[in-house]
Curated annotation (Swiss-Prot):
Taxonomic path: Eukaryota, Metazoa, Ecdysozoa, Arthropoda, Chelicerata
First-listed, main subcellular location of the protein, grouped into a coarse class: secreted
Keyword ATP-binding in record: no
Record keywords, A-Z: Disulfide bond, Knottin, Secreted, Signal, Toxin
PROSITE patterns linked: SPIDER_CSTX
Organism (species): Lycosa singoriensis (Wolf spider)
Cystines in this chain: C44-C59, C51-C68, C58-C86, C70-C84
Descriptive protein name: U1-lycotoxin-Ls1k
Similarity comment text for this entry: Belongs to the neurotoxin 19 (CSTX) family. 04 (U1-Lctx) subfamily.
UniProt subcellular location: Secreted
Database matches in Pfam families: Toxin_35
Comment on protein domains: The presence of a 'disulfide through disulfide knot' structurally defines this protein as a knottin.
Molecular function GO labels: toxin activity
Expression by tissue: Expressed by the venom gland.
Amino acid sequence: MMKVLVVVALLVTLISYSSSEGIDDLEADELLSLMANEQTRKECIPKHHECTSNKHGCCRGNFFKYKCQCTTVVTQDGEQTERCFCGTPPRHKAAELVVGFGKKIFG
């Protein structure tokens, strides 16, 4: 019985977190891009592809929109450049893992 209560509490927390995260993700520029034509959606940047020149153009994943994650790369000449790729942030990976686990348990 205790395990069921823990799983239910975890799922309620996840659902409330994801709904608040969805509201936070809808910034003004993203809202405008969502209201634009659907060609924008077809031209979004897939997961693991470079988004250095278009940091708000990442596609949506299963539950969340991918985020443009940037790192600084130092070449052998000592030059520093910023390289970015679309990926799933760690907190979104954790949420997807919990949801997947919940689906396996509750079918």
